[in-house]
Design a protein with these regions (language model features):
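Amphipathic alpha-helical assembly/interaction segments
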Residues: 1-134
Length: 134
């Protein structure tokens, strides 16, 4: 890693917390009762998307910026693309659950948008830091 953990500020690693919180929140929503016709594909695929986002963020954060810049950028971009897929998937399964409140759906949308903005900002700052070292 480019910055030792003990020297990091909270804002540098906040996206990891957001990704893990999103994963847990999606898992808790998926534990609600959904209709059987959408259970297998909808629930499993939605959970896979949330897990992939968290895994990509954790893996990308473990890479050194200057050594693995391309791999790190690819993983962050993949996480952003998976966030887009997750938001589409959640909009599809929304009609199949009546136990999840509108407030929970709104919180989920805000969490997805915030994480997407965090990841875009990280990609931008990584590019600036990488170009500065060249």
């Amino acid at each position: 890693m480019s910055v030792p953990t003990y020297e990091r500020k909270e804002s540098k690693i906040e996206f990891l917390d957001k990704a893990i919180q999103l994963h847990k929140f999606v898992a808790s929503i998926l534990c609600e009762r959904f209709s059987k016709k959408f259970t297998f594909y909808g629930i499993n695929k939605t959970y896979e998307y949330a897990a992939k986002i968290a895994e990509n963020c954790i893996k990308a954060n473990s890479y050194d910026l200057y050594t693995y810049y391309n791999e790190r950028t690819f993983l962050f971009n993949d996480a952003i693309a998976t966030l887009n897929c997750l938001s589409i998937q959640l909009s599809l399964i929304k009609e199949y659950s009546n136990k999840v409140t509108e407030k929970q759906w709104a919180k989920l949308g805000v969490d997805i948008a915030n994480l997407r903005n965090y990841l875009k900002a990280i990609i931008k700052s990584d590019k600036e830091r990488f170009d500065k070292k060249k």
